[in-house]
């Protein structure tokens, strides 16, 4: 029976059982339950498992080295679901101690399967939101990587931090302004739009875009900002007309 076929109480009991069995595995170095949960076909079972690992790491300092060693072992498994769940578990740890799990993301970016790579992007988002300094410093190293997909994924990964704190990621986005790859460019424009519609954010974005050298890209970005205020009109701090008026008044050369 799938996770969400269970009742709310049954789900809570299952999550508790998963946590207990993983804790027992780590204490006894067996890893049977850990391996099974990390490989489970049910996304929510795997999620419960990696969240449990993150909680155990935080609450039981004596098991931290064991957890890192175990994740390293599991990261070499052939099953991509296990490798994906390892990265998600590392992402939970990286919310507080990124340096201890950085190697999992260095490796996961180049995984042969898209699922672990996507887990890296998801982890960058959740870690960057609460632990931005080391995560963004790490991301910056890959902004000019020769693989265009790596550049695109990093650009996408830092977006969530920028939703509330655009000033933190705009200097990194600026480094991509002359990227010649269409997919990277379109992702860059998309991210600029995504970090510009919440309260106080359009002002920060515009103040940065004024200094960008690639005026053609700036124009694309401004059009995206206007359109984002239409698409997200129920959530945006300004209406589409207000956003367009603000841009015309503050960066008219871009439109």
Residue ranges and their predicted role:
Residues 25-37, 58-74, 95-108, 130-142, ...:
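Amphipathic alpha-helical scaffolding segments comprising HEAT/armadillo-like alpha-solenoid repeats
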Residues 213-255:
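Eukaryotic acidic, Ser/Thr-rich intrinsically disordered low-complexity regions
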Residues 33-53:
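Short, contiguous, helix-prone interaction/anchoring segments in small proteins
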Residues 40, 156, 165, 254-255:
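N-terminal secretory/membrane-targeting helices
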Residues 141-143, 148-159, 170-175, 182-183:
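Extended, charged alpha-helical interaction scaffolds
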Residues 7, 41-43, 78-79, 112-113, ...:
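Short inter-helical turns and helix N-cap capping residues of alpha-solenoid HEAT/ARM repeat scaffolds
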Residues 2-25, 47-61, 83-96, 115-130, ...:
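Structural detector for internal amphipathic alpha-helices that build alpha-solenoid repeat scaffolds
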Residues 44, 81, 100, 115, ...:
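Structural detector for tandem alpha-solenoid helical repeats, activating at a conserved register
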């Amino acid at each position: 029976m799938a996770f969400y076929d269970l009742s709310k109480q049954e789900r809570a009991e299952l999550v508790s059982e998963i946590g207990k069995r993983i804790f027992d595995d780590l204490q006894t170095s067996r890893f049977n339950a850990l391996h099974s949960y990390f490989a489970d076909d049910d996304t929510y079972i795997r999620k419960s498992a990696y969240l449990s690992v993150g909680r155990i790491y935080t609450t039981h300092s004596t098991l931290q080295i064991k957890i890192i060693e175990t994740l390293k072992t599991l990261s070499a498994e052939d099953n991509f679901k296990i490798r994906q769940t390892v990265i998600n578990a590392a992402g939970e740890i990286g919310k507080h101690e990124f340096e201890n799990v950085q190697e999992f993301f260095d490796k996961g970016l180049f995984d042969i399967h898209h699922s672990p790579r996507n887990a890296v992007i998801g982890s960058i988002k959740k870690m960057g939101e609460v632990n931005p300094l080391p995560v963004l410093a790490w991301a910056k190293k890959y902004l000019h990587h020769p693989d265009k997909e790596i550049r695109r994924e990093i650009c996408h990964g830092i977006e969530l931090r920028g939703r509330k704190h655009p000033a933190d990621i705009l200097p990194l986005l600026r480094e991509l302004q002359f990227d010649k790859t269409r997919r990277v460019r379109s992702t860059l424009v998309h991210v600029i739009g995504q970090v510009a519609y919440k309260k106080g954010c359009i002002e920060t974005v515009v103040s940065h875009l004024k200094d960008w050298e690639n005026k053609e890209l700036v124009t694309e970005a401004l059009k995206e900002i206007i359109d984002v205020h239409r698409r997200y009109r129920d959530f945006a701090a300004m209406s589409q007309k207000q956003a367009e008026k603000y841009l015309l008044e503050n960066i008219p050369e871009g439109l």
